[in-house]
């Protein structure tokens, strides 16, 4: 049976094949927030997200807003407590960190903070070769913002990690 994919903002569905076994597949995070409409606006202002599609339901909540951030997709959904679908504030935090790799980490970091993100870890030149920092968005999701600066051999990264966490 073919899978269905939502295409663009026109909600047209078309068949597509599942990725062949052994082929690279992509993961699209589907995060839960309190206020998907507000979250979509925040992600637009913070990260330049563009809305691809949305699925509202009759009670006014949004089952999904699909956003494009750079080359990736992010789905947002309002909370559905009756189904156990809860946002970070409802569960006391988040066990997941979203990673956003960018060309200019300083600019993206500043833009996200201006939009309302809170700094959890300031940008710093890290031992694995990235300019890296962490933000928490107003909806309780954490974001690692990284800019690759230089390639470092894995054995050197492992040794540096051992020193950093000793």
Descriptions of predicted regions:
Residues 2-30, 41, 47-136, 146-166:
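Vicinal oxygen chelate
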Residues 33-37:
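Short acidic-aromatic low-complexity motifs
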Residues 139:
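Conserved ATPase active-site switch/coordination loops adjacent to the nucleotide-binding site
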